[in-house]
Amino acid sequence: MKVAVLGAAGGIGQALALLLKTQLPSGSELSLYDIAPVTPGVAVDLSHIPTAVKIKGYSGEDAKPALAGADIVLISAGVARKPGMDRSDLFNVNAGIVRNLVEQIAITCPKACIGIITNPVNTTVAIAAEVLKKAGVYDKNKLFGVTTLDIIRSNTFVAELKGKQPQDINVPVIGGHSGVTILPLLSQVSGISFSEQEVADLTKRIQNAGTEVVEAKAGGGSATLSMGQAAARFGLSLVRALQGENGVVECAYVESDGKHARFFAQPILLGKDGVAERKDIGTLSAFEQNALSSMLDTLKQDIELGETFIK
């Protein structure tokens, strides 16, 4: 199993690479790529950690040597949010970066599963899909927007509020991966009930959690460490599913049946070929139904922005 991390010298990429080096199954290969010249050194640094994961770093304009033979590619390359920016302000820079990297994936490892971390995810996933489609290699079951950070935040915040163990909480989060498009389905958390005020407050906190980190870091960065952990969780789940483990379910932003929007975050069953099943989002509360209806225009606009960027 070979996993490639693109953008591996950045804050998310380094955290993700560290977690993968320590947690990938023995015998796995980890390939690190970034435009920054430090990247081979990041790989050397990580290579001293005593786990049976082979690691190599690549830098420069050409990602193809890093991508050769990859089963999974995780893309965290791009610029990070600064105070006062929202995820869509990142579009102008990050759209081109994602396009360039996915064009190289289409040539080098077209059958790989691709996890997009680079924001704005609502839009960058649509860009990736259109690039792959243009190259004639698009498989909607192998392209994912990594929204796992919304899930781990939801689990953490619910556990804090209710005095529970976070590992015992599982909040499904649907929709997209920015602002109002992030919709935690708190009504589906088993064994816990919330007041209307708690639901409103938690939903808002989960939607704005990225901004909470950006502001707390006072211009020194965005959510890199928690995002690294979230991306590692998703990547490791994908590894387990590709290796034949049954019953691996994660929420992710994938091309859906189009009922809500072309791309939609929902619980998915992972399998040997990527998405095995898009699971039903279940019954929503009135609050959730209303939030879903009112976010769809925003989500569809985000998607269209990505589609037109390529077309």
Swiss-Prot record:
Enzyme class of the recorded protein, top EC level: oxidoreductase
Pfam families, A to Z: Ldh_1_C (PF02866), Ldh_1_N (PF00056)
InterPro entries: L-lactate/malate_DH, Lactate/malate_DH_C, Lactate/malate_DH_N, Lactate_DH/Glyco_Ohase_4_C, Malate_DH_AS, Malate_DH_type1, Malate_DH_type1_bac, NAD(P)-bd_dom_sf
CDD domains: MDH_glyoxysomal_mitochondrial (cd01337)
Chain residues that bind substrate: R81, R87, N119, R153
Keyword presence, NAD: yes
A single BP term in Gene Ontology: tricarboxylic acid cycle
PROSITE patterns reported for this sequence: MDH
Cited Gene3D superfamilies: Lactate dehydrogenase/glycoside hydrolase, family 4, C-terminal, NAD(P)-binding Rossmann-like Domain
Residue positions binding NAD(+): G7, A8, A9, G10, G11, I12, G13, D34, N94, I117, T118, N119, M227
Molecular function terms, GO-annotated: L-malate dehydrogenase (NAD+) activity
List of catalytic residues: H177
The protein's assembly and partners: Homodimer.
General function of this protein: Catalyzes the reversible oxidation of malate to oxaloacetate.
Family statement drawn from the similarity comment of this UniProt entry: Belongs to the LDH/MDH superfamily. MDH type 1 family.
Protein name according to UniProt: Malate dehydrogenase
UniProt organism field: Pectobacterium atrosepticum (strain SCRI 1043 / ATCC BAA-672)
Lineage: Bacteria, Pseudomonadati, Pseudomonadota, Gammaproteobacteria, Enterobacterales
